[in-house]
């Protein structure tokens, strides 16, 4: 899913998101433990499933715009948009799923018909150099993540303009961080990919 605003197929998204409190719940980039890796892969899968199965009018990748670019995944929020997320306001205790970069491929977009084809497509969308993420000026470890083969059923008014109930497959790859909740106040997230830099504000409401 590509990022260009209206067309969001096979796109590279540099979405601004994240959270960091006193301690990051993510380890060094290449070597996340199995439990953490499963959680990161699962969070990326949940995020992309939400994007693909949410109607366009309520979708930041569709016609919904910035009003819908803070995605709620249980007790975690993921700022995620085809271009950039200016800010997300969250409750105290909310974790933030940070996507430094993600590329999605699906059968809806004609990117392939098998797990292997879609996975290769998603991996080919990687930037030459992994992104970096910082929170309030401090670097955050970034981990590579990849979804399992996702089985998607499109809603009415979906972002692809296909008939409601259309079924298909999707795989996404990305570089992410899952961090503990931030303290109340305003925090600055900076994601840098190559020469591109995106800044997002995370506003944690007072208890």
Model regions: which residues?
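Bacterial N-terminal signal peptides that target proteins for export
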Residues: 3-15
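Bacterial N-terminal signal peptides
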Residues: 14-24
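C-terminal region of N-terminal signal peptides and the immediate post-cleavage residues
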Residues: 23-37
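Short, solvent-exposed, Trp/other aromatic-anchored flexible loops in extracytoplasmic proteins
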Residues: 169-183
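Solvent-exposed, flexible loop/coil segments flanking beta-strands in beta-rich domains
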Residues: 39-97, 102-103, 206-207
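Edge beta-strands of extracellular beta-sandwich domains
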Residues: 198-203
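Extracellular-facing segments of soluble proteins and assemblies that are Gly/Ser/Thr-biased and enriched
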Residues: 74-164
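A glycine-anchored, Pro-Gly-centered beta-turn/N-cap motif
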Residues: 94, 183-186, 190
